[in-house]
């Protein structure tokens, strides 16, 4: 059984043509991308590395990692989003190998293949996030890096990430997030403990509305990032 929610897939497929419009529904991802990219590169040193972007969507992070010299493969189950990603890759001249395949299926086919695996803003959209974490651990080489980003589950994150972002500021379309699927850092840590990965760093991401920018912080109450390594 595919670890995907048909409703979630359809939601993002319907918006696929808007992925690369920096002023449309995916504007927060465009604003967030430089922060997460810099953080990933600081840990993994992407140049010359083989990287896998799970849940790549339209390819915002995939192209950015390729631009820093990584050999990138992006996977997603939305063929509409991958079509947009392929087209933008042709237009930008940045080479990324895209494929419509589930992380678990790729893990069976290509275990221990990648130096870097990213799974950003995806875990909160799937029925079994633990299954995705396990697949990431299988896909990465011994000594390699795995990076996650997701949303904490508490009153503050509900007020800011759902009510504030979707209904008040309208930074995101209504219904983008299902609060019940938000993941506490302790829960994500428990998923990681069931694999060969170990957590190296957990960082928060804070949005500054005055400057309209994201920045790394020690506040993990809403958005947070987790860097992991697989044992050598």
From Swiss-Prot:
Root EC class: transferase
Organism in which the protein naturally occurs: Burkholderia ambifaria (strain MC40-6)
Name of the featured protein: Ubiquinone biosynthesis O-methyltransferase
Binding site for S-adenosyl-L-methionine: 36, 55, 76, 120
InterPro entries in the record: SAM-dependent_MTases_sf, UbiG_MeTrfase
Function, as annotated: O-methyltransferase that catalyzes the 2 O-methylation steps in the ubiquinone biosynthetic pathway.
EC number: 2.1.1.222, 2.1.1.64
Sequence similarity: Belongs to the methyltransferase superfamily. UbiG/COQ3 family.
GO molecular function: 2-polyprenyl-6-hydroxyphenol methylase activity; 3-demethylubiquinol 3-O-methyltransferase activity; polyprenyldihydroxybenzoate methyltransferase activity
SUPFAM superfamilies: S-adenosyl-L-methionine-dependent methyltransferases
Disulphide connectivity of cysteines: none
Catalytic activity: a 3-demethylubiquinol + S-adenosyl-L-methionine = a ubiquinol + S-adenosyl-L-homocysteine + H(+); a 3-(all-trans-polyprenyl)benzene-1,2-diol + S-adenosyl-L-methionine = a 2-methoxy-6-(all-trans-polyprenyl)phenol + S-adenosyl-L-homocysteine + H(+)
Superkingdom to which the source organism belongs: Bacteria
């Amino acid at each position: 059984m595919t670890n995907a929610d048909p409703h979630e897939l359809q939601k993002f497929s319907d918006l696929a043509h808007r992925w690369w419009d920096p002023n449309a529904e995916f504007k927060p991802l465009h604003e967030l991308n430089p922060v997460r990219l810099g953080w990933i590169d600081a840990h993994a040193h992407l140049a010359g590395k083989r990287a896998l972007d799970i849940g790549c969507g339209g390819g915002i992070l995939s192209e950015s990692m390729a631009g820093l010299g990584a050999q990138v493969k992006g996977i997603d189950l939305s063929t509409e989003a991958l079509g947009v990603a392929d087209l933008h890759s042709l237009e930008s001249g940045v080479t990324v190998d895209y494929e419509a395949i589930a992380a678990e299926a790729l893990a069976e086919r290509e275990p221990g293949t990648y130096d870097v695996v990213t799974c950003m803003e995806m875990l909160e959209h799937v029925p079994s996030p633990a299954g995705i974490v396990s697949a990431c651990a299988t896909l990465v080489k011994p000594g390699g890096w795995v990076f996650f980003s997701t949303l904490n589950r508490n009153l503050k994150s509900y007020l800011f990430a759902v009510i504030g972002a979707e209904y008040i500021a309208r930074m995101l379309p209504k219904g983008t997030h299902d609060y019940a699927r938000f993941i506490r850092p302790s829960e994500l840590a428990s998923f990681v403990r069931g694999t060969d990965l170990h957590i190296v760093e957990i960082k928060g991401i804070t949005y500054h509305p005055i400057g309209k920018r994201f920045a790394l912080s020690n506040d993990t109450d809403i958005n947070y990032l987790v860097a992991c390594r697989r044992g050598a």
